[in-house]
């Protein structure tokens, strides 16, 4: 189970309502969301919460996992995105300062800004 409000649950809490934290992590913390149907176009726009210095994870797409890592250190923010080789994903990374960086034909992108 994922909820601590009921530590002595008499039944399984492995249900759809327990999957919201995974969605929130992928969408808000990592910042990945489709901008066209079928995940053919993806935007990666992390919303780094206060107190969190880095996050990384993989977001499943129909073309394979999209790897995302961001780090905040000494006023700098660095975002790395990797898509599966040969995947027809159009990826745009949007940094916290608003700069949009398209991935292009490479399978990896690293971009930085000052916070």
Residue ranges with predicted function:
Residues 1-115:
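Non-catalytic C-terminal accessory modules of carbohydrate-active enzymes
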């Amino acid at each position: 189970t994922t909820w601590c409000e009921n530590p002595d649950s008499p039944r399984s809490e492995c249900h759809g309502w327990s999957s919201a934290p995974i969605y929130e992590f992928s969408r808000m913390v990592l910042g990945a969301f489709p901008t066209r149907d079928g995940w053919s176009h993806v935007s990666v726009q992390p919303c780094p919460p206060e107190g969190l210095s880095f996050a990384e994870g993989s977001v499943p797409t129909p073309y394979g996992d999209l790897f995302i890592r961001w780090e905040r250190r000494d006023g700098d923010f660095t975002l790395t995105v990797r898509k599966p080789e040969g995947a027809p994903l159009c990826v745009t990374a949007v940094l916290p300062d608003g700069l949009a960086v398209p991935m292009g034909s490479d399978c990896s992108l690293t971009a930085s800004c000052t916070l």
